[in-house]
């Protein structure tokens, strides 16, 4: 699979990041030193997102919410790729990394630096973690196209990239036994309703399993198969 897609998929699933947050992540906000990893303190800090916006939307957002406007390859285009502040304050957050993902990011940084050295001045360094080979920002349509191809090649059901973030939320709620606040801290949801809804679905699935276990543990016993409910007493 394409390396940047591999990195993006891991960030989405392990860190519960949105697409714009993945594409807007910069290396200055990735903390993966030997000390960080050894102390289980490797993390990414999410404080911006990458998106494409119209000139009018850019004017509406204003300077305080936009960190950077990328120069377009085609000057006459009516939209611009921008790095901007997330929509809600709850989206600004620290998300801790599993060790494996920390090492994946280190290897990715190493290969990115090698490419940067090879291209020299042709590499446009914006400090982006998930970038095109020349360093320029990678738009969501590129990741979505690569993800769709990977899914089709693997013969998997039709799922979208965002499913990884949803699955991440579900998996974390199972692992932490329903710690809604800790999960919300990772996902950056402004309201806890979404997390609660996902957890309610998990509980329903677990309760189905309870019924199956009860069937195996109780009703499947040979001496219980012939048990019948007591007959109603006959009228004298």
What are these regions (language model features)?
Residues 10, 14, 21, 142, ...:
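C-terminal catalytic core of tyrosine-transesterase DNA break-rejoin enzymes
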Residues 33-36, 40-43, 48-89, 101, ...:
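C-terminal secondary-structure termini that scaffold catalytic or DNA-interacting sites
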Residues 38, 48-52, 187-213:
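Catalytic-site neighborhood detector that most strongly recognizes the C-terminal catalytic loop/helix
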Residues 25, 108-111, 175:
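Residue-level signal for well-ordered alpha-helical positions
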Residues 31, 45, 94-96:
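Generic structural detector for well-ordered beta-strands
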Residues 1-19, 23, 37-41, 90-92, ...:
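Basic, Lys/Arg- and aromatic-enriched nucleic-acid-binding interface segment
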Residues 24, 32:
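Phosphate-coordinating loops and pocket residues in cytosolic domains that bind phosphorylated ligands
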Residues 72-82, 88-156:
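Active-site/catalytic core of tyrosine-dependent DNA strand-transfer enzymes
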């Amino acid at each position: 699979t394409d390396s940047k897609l591999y990195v993006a998929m891991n960030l989405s699933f392990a860190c519960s990041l949105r697409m714009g947050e993945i594409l807007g992540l910069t290396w200055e906000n990735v903390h993966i030193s030997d000390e960080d990893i050894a102390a289980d303190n490797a993390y990414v800090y999410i404080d911006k997102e990458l998106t494409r916006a119209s000139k009018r939307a850019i004017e509406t957002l204003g300077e305080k919410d936009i960190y950077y406007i990328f120069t377009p390859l085609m000057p006459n285009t009516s939209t611009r790729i921008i790095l901007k502040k997330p929509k809600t304050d709850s989206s600004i957050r620290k998300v801790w990394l599993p060790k494996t993902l920390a090492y994946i990011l280190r290897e990715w940084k190493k290969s990115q630096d090698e490419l940067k050295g090879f291209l020299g001045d042709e590499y446009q360094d914006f400090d982006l973690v998930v970038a095109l080979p020349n360093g320029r920002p990678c738009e969501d349509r590129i990741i979505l196209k690569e993800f769709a191809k990977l899914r089709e090649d693997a013969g998997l059901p039709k799922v979208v990239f965002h499913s990884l973030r949803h699955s991440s939320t579900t998996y974390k709620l199972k692992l932490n036994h329903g710690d809604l606040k800790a999960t919300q801290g990772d996902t950056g949801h402004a309201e806890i309703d979404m997390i609660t809804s996902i957890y309610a679905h998990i509980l329903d699935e677990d309760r189905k399993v309870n019924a199956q276990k009860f069937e195996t543990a109780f009703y499947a016993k040979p001496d219980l198969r012939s048990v019948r409910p007591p007959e109603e007493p006959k009228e004298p």
